[in-house]
């Protein structure tokens, strides 16, 4: 209906230029201008277009509506807003929406936004009934409440189960107070439990990550909140400043201020390079590390403790090497140097002159220097 409707009988066309309304059983559409093509069962609307449905409303500059299929086609800036409690809204400039099935397909630029998450991609499919979105090509899933953005070639987001995953050149960016963590893996998975107040993201296969004060590689990795614990699994290696950290299992508490604590379990090993042929080393069953201002400052060794560290004079020249064995140890670190060591329970320590033993005889069991695997930049995580 309209205050003034012009109808062309031979062409079976009608139009209005001063606000009109189109209604069916569930939908009410209004616009300033409208053109109805009866033979094509198509209506074109422009200027202040509003489509209202019990479940949603569409606000657009212009759209075409196919009356036989109840499909809205968008060719300009469009916003689809859910009227339910989930507050989901969609933005697009090119795509279509099946109003009967509540399914849509959008082409770039596009975005689906829920309470704390947004999804976008070159192509985006969204089912308003199941609350499932699928994206293809330059996919981005952002969790605004956790400062996490996941990107890749293919993505999936389920609002009901609060899960999402991305594959293909997958990258996770987690913003901290001072810098950002960049992580790559074959597949990235995120899940949120709103009732328990817990969220997690997991990386599977070929994990590599870079942060200004922390880098690492492993097969799989998980991070949970609110405990802020990162767990590395299967051949994990971690680097902090000049220290290389390995163990069968590595667990770290990393908050917005950076790394705080470190737990190494089974075959625990920390080493740093003294010079081109010499290495400071610590090994044991279990290690508990503590960070100060983002740097590993102290390590408590529990079980089968061993250490090798080099001593220097006031000018930095090597004077000797300390080889110690003790069940438990407390070691203080200053960068790549051991600044203090306390041996607990039956200590056995020897300080050798620097030239008495060749460096090859001072490599502890389990030593391996893996610097070639270390990610050196954001781009290097894709190596």
PLM regions and their residue ranges:
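Structural signature for solvent-exposed beta-strand/loop edge elements and short helix-capping sites
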Residues: 1-383
